[in-house]
A protein has these predicted regions:
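P-loop NTPase motor core
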Residues: 1-100
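Mid-core helix/loop region of P-loop NTP-binding domains shared across ATPases and GTPases
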Residues: 6, 60-159
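Surface-exposed beta-strand-to-loop junctions
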Residues: 18-25, 121-125, 160-162
Length: 174
């Protein structure tokens, strides 16, 4: 194949790049994979981990991101939630501390969430977090990705770059 470009095409691309917003998530699939995850869902889990991190959610606890953080964000109170957690001595932006609070102070966390978003069903969220009910599917990931991108505009791109894919596949095939 012979690729030919004229100056106007290159100039158009350069102009788009100047106004574009491009976010990247770069990760190594083999080192990001949680061995306790069903191997058939490994790719989905890792992509969800990093996508949740890009959205400002906990990237290590998909259940917490899906059932607590995302509903708070959808209601516009996620930042207020993090401030209230800080008032209680926690740092929700630290994934380890957030996980510790979920493990050790779940009632407090859910009380704060319900205080800011009274329509949340604390008991349903509690049950899902305890059971690690992730309700993961490619359709759900695609829907959440589409919703995230919807408000970003035509000049936004999110690039997910996964390294070591072939090594992971070959290792898991054995």
């Amino acid at each position: 194949h012979s690729l030919q470009f004229d100056f106007r095409e290159i100039e158009s691309i350069a102009n788009w790049l100047r106004r574009a917003t491009i976010d990247t998530c770069i990760f190594n699939l083999e080192t990001s994979y949680d061995n306790s995850t069903d191997k058939k869902k490994a790719f989905l889990h890792v992509f969800f981990f990093f996508f949740n991190g890009k959205r400002g959610f906990n990237k290590f606890n998909i259940t917490m991101a899906q059932h607590l953080e995302k509903p708070l964000a959808d209601k516009g109170v996620f930042e207020a939630f993090k401030k209230r957690i800080a008032e209680e001595g926690g740092d929700w932006n630290d994934p380890g501390m957030a996980a510790d609070m979920i493990d050790n102070e779940l009632s407090l966390v859910l009380d704060i969430a319900a205080e800011l978003a009274p329509s949340l069903d604390k008991e349903s969220i509690r049950e899902r977090i305890i059971k690690r009910d992730t309700n993961m599917s490619i359709e759900r990931f695609g829907g959440e990705l589409a919703a995230y991108l919807k408000d970003k505009g035509d000049d936004y791109r999110l690039i997910l770059l996964a390294d070591e894919v072939s090594q992971f596949i070959n290792k898991e095939r054995d």
